[in-house]
Amino acid sequence: MSFEQIKKVSVVIPIYNEEESLPLLLERTLAACKQLTQEYELILVDDGSSDKSAEILIQAAEQPENHIIAILLNRNYGQHSAIMAGFNQVNGDLIITLDADLQNPPEEIPRLVKTAEQGYDVVGTRRANRQDSLFRKTASKIINAMITKATGRSMGDYGCMLRAYRRHIVEAMLQCHERSTFIPILANTFARKTIEIDVAHAEREFGDSKYSFMKLINLMYDLLTCLTTAPLRLLSVVGSVIAVSGFLLAVLLMVLRLIFGAIWAAEGVFTLFALLFIFIGAQFVAMGLLGEYIGRIYNDVRARPRYFIQKVVGDNKTNDNQEEY
């Protein structure tokens, strides 16, 4: 497959309560883009920030000839929905995503462009010498292993959002309308040729991570139910094993009752209660997992917008109240 020459690069950055890091982010990202031989644009998506992030973005986008487009969402929809909103506005042949916390340096952008020029659909990244807590590193390894098992695509660091996508990959992703989206996995679904390179990783200088413990748990549920139906098959297997085990246990208890009498059966009542609680617990876990799938089906059937764009500023245009799916 031959690839068209990269004439323009679009950088999409989701923003959520990053007013402290925004001035430095804009300065470093624009400086990195100026090193490119291609044209470029910087698309910043405010994901319903409650601080002054939106005001800073508007001021930056209103400056003449600064290649910045600011997209304001009416509320917080989540990182990946915000990126999809940015994808809808891109004009580049290569689209790069970047987090706003500056843990992945914008200075890596030219290297991603050079790598993509070698003919790759997707350029992924691995965080070298990762500057995160042991908990976050462990959680990331578990999630990456789960994704690799479910997708069959071996990539070392799905959690790093510093990535480059060819335009046809982005257009394919925009055709997908599921409510829950994990962009790196979705992109690899359509990619024919991918690569992963090591990039620098720094400690977070401003604010705290937007992924709390509960959000990481929700992310794992999202990935589990978005990627595969294997858990449903596993439930069938586990249910069958429990049913057979219960039948065999019932036979065993009847035999023991015949041999040792009713006194033995009374003495084993607590064991029966323990087994009963185990089976009830397994049923509730299964019901919860089924509920996750049913809930996602319900959300998809309602077909509500994935996000709602309140305003677009920059690139010689200002639009209000644009609804996007």
From Swiss-Prot:
EC number per UniProt? 2.4.2.53
* Superkingdom of the organism of origin: Bacteria
Q: Name one GO molecular function term.
A: phosphotransferase activity, for other substituted phosphate groups
Q: How does it sit in the membrane?
A: Multi-pass membrane protein
Q: Does the keyword Magnesium apply?
A: no
* HAMAP family referenced in this protein's UniProt entry, alphabetically: ArnC_transfer
Protein name in UniProt: Undecaprenyl-phosphate 4-deoxy-4-formamido-L-arabinose transferase
- Source organism: Photorhabdus laumondii subsp. laumondii (strain DSM 15139 / CIP 105565 / TT01)
- The gene behind this protein is arnC
